[in-house]
Swiss-Prot record:
Enzyme Commission (EC) number: 2.8.1.4
Protein species of origin: Staphylococcus aureus (strain MRSA252)
Family label: Belongs to the ThiI family.
This protein's pathway: Cofactor biosynthesis; thiamine diphosphate biosynthesis
Name of the protein this chain belongs to: Probable tRNA sulfurtransferase
Amino acid sequence: MKYDHLLVRYGELTLKGSNRKKFVNQLRNNVNKSLKGLDGFVVKGKRDRMYIELEDHADINEITNRLSKIFGIKSISPVLKVEKSIEAMSAETIKFAQQFEENSTFKIDVKRADKNFPMDTYELQRELGGTVLKQIENVSVNVKRPDHEIRVEVRLDAIYMYEEVVPGSGGLPVGTGGKTLLMLSGGIDSPVAGMEVMRRGVTIEAIHFHSPPFTSDQAKEKVIELTRILAERVGPIKLHIVPFTELQKQVNKVVHPRYTMTSTRRMMMRVADKLVHQIGAYAIVNGENLGQVASQTLHSMYAINNVTSTPVLRPLLTYDKEEIIIKSKEIGTFETSIQPFEDCCTIFTPKNPVTEPNFDKVVQYESVFDFEEMINRAVENIETLEITSDYKTIKEQQTNQLINDFL
């Protein structure tokens, strides 16, 4: 079947009342960004749904695949736009039915938004179903569990007919919920946390703490790849890479070994807090999960959060680990996250970290050195990369150049 339109159904933005126009406009912008590089289509965003008009050469599969990853879209259907007559509907219904397997079952589902259309919903279903039974052999009706369901929408401008419904990502359009800073470690949890807040319409920038020579270039490239995967859904994402070696060495030098993890996290939070204000964000996001490790108990979270007044969002706080792994696989970050390149947190993990840190003690340990000056140096020397869905690391660029030179 050759379709001439894609029907895009909105997610939660249909509930946004007087703000709906803002959400629709943002979604249309996100769709245009996602489809950049493709041609043969025109995006038409309307109040209650979006239509994408397709030319003959449009790559419908690639367009549909990209749309399915955009937050704010509930589902997508390749559709035929048909003139508003029973004759035209019947002719297209037969074309659909001619593709049915022998002895298969079908159902006609009609939605009539145009109440002035001369036939009501049930009359249309009977008329179109009867036409199929008369002209197509060895098929039958099954309204409960059909093999095929021909869907017909009678709207004010035209009639739209389709069979397939491709699930979207749901949620709200990214760009409607403000900006946050994601603490991206390179593990399984933080990319999922980033995806969860983006699903709520939030724009993210990411921060990663890099401690060479203790952490490798591969660990850095791993985080770049995770950011690239996230960017496939929302467009370019800024990744801020913090030189953290000086701070981390000093913490491990002067802080009691059981408290180094708590103090390290507090230093990270201080750096993130300064960057939040620089980039105009309103919250910090991390992948913490209650009770999963020593730094993620309530006592630890209290001690760590104390260094900032910026809201800290933890979208995975109550998830089971297995739930997080499933989501990681769904969004495509799992295989990258489990690559064996350690970040600065895992390399310096103490043997017996405190799970219920005494707040006064950690403050006392930190009081013996001037961490504020080190934090400022770390912020001043941040490396910022803009990661797109087709971003290539320096190593990948060099490899590609060698291949081109060889050819």
